Every structure is written in structure tokens, then in C-alpha cells.
Amino acid sequence: MAFKDNAVELEERVVAVNRVTKVVKGGRRLRFAALVVVGDHNGRVGFGTGKAQEVPEAIRKAVDDAKKNLIEVPMVGTTIPHEVLSEFGGAKVLLKPAVEGSGVAAGGAVRAVVELAGVADITSKSLGSNTPINIVRATVEGLKQLKRAEEIAALRGISVSDLA
């Protein structure tokens, strides 16, 4: 789900920059691939990739791509509503809600995504592959799976108090 109103300032964080080569008849063609996460620290986050012959241009393309792929993250206070395990490729990411004041217990790429989403208290574990792009994609997939208690109650046709 893309958001059109860019009135809110989005913070950008470069997660990875890779040097990639393409072997051609005359030798090797060098380019740079960038992975960037953007978020407003208020429940909106997105990631994007860009490739170019210069690093700044690759980052600019990645930022533009990330702004087109923003998602809304449901939150309960400063954490997520429930535990979620998501996979992408060989990467698995486990996201668990944490009590207020715990902080962000997450490494590398997962930390970038959840901090820019505005989640202040969360515990996470990355399992399997630790490739940054797959970790970011798995984290975003996990955040997409989250549902508030009100949404679950509405789907089941019961009141929120009957969920417990």
C-alpha cells in the first residue's frame, strides 16, 4: 500500500551497499547496488533497492523505490500486537512484543526496519540466512502479518473482551 502524502518527513537508513560486476566481452562492468529503509517513526516503513554506476545515485534510486513501497505497521503502545515468524528466501525472522522500556533487541537489518517504523520495544531473532535484503524482506513480511485485537475480533465476529 503506497502513501501519496509526502508531507511527513521520512528518515532514510542505508542498510547495505554492494559492488556488483557484470562480465562482458571487454572485461568487467562495475556497478553498485544499494538497499535502503525509510520510515517516519510513526508506524510507516518501506524498503527499496537501487543500482547505478555511482554509490550516491544507487542510494537515491533505492530511496525513491522505498518511498513507493511504504506499509502501515499496527502498534500497541510502543510495541507490536503479537509474536510473528516470517520467512523470505532462506531468511527467517522472529518478532516478539516486549514490555515498555525494553528497547529494541534486534540486529542489523531488522533493527533498521523496526526503529524506522517507530517500534520502541521489541525482541527479534534472525534465523537461517543473514543476507541483508532477505532479512529486510522477511521483517517487512512479518510486519505486514500483524493485526490489532480489534481486527481479529471483527474477523471472528466477537467482541475484543471475548478474545482472551
From Swiss-Prot:
Coiled coil: none annotated. GO terms for molecular function: rRNA binding; structural constituent of ribosome. Residues 10-73 form the S5 DRBM domain. Keywords: Ribonucleoprotein, Ribosomal protein, RNA-binding, rRNA-binding. InterPro entries: Ribosomal_Su5_D2-typ_SF, Ribosomal_uS5, Ribosomal_uS5_bac-type, Ribosomal_uS5_C, Ribosomal_uS5_N, Ribosomal_uS5_N_CS, Ribsml_uS5_D2-typ_fold_subgr. One of its GO terms (cellular component) is small ribosomal subunit. Belongs to the universal ribosomal protein uS5 family. Part of the 30S ribosomal subunit. Contacts proteins S4 and S8. This is Small ribosomal subunit protein uS5. The lineage of its organism: Bacteria, Bacillati, Bacillota, Bacilli, Lactobacillales.
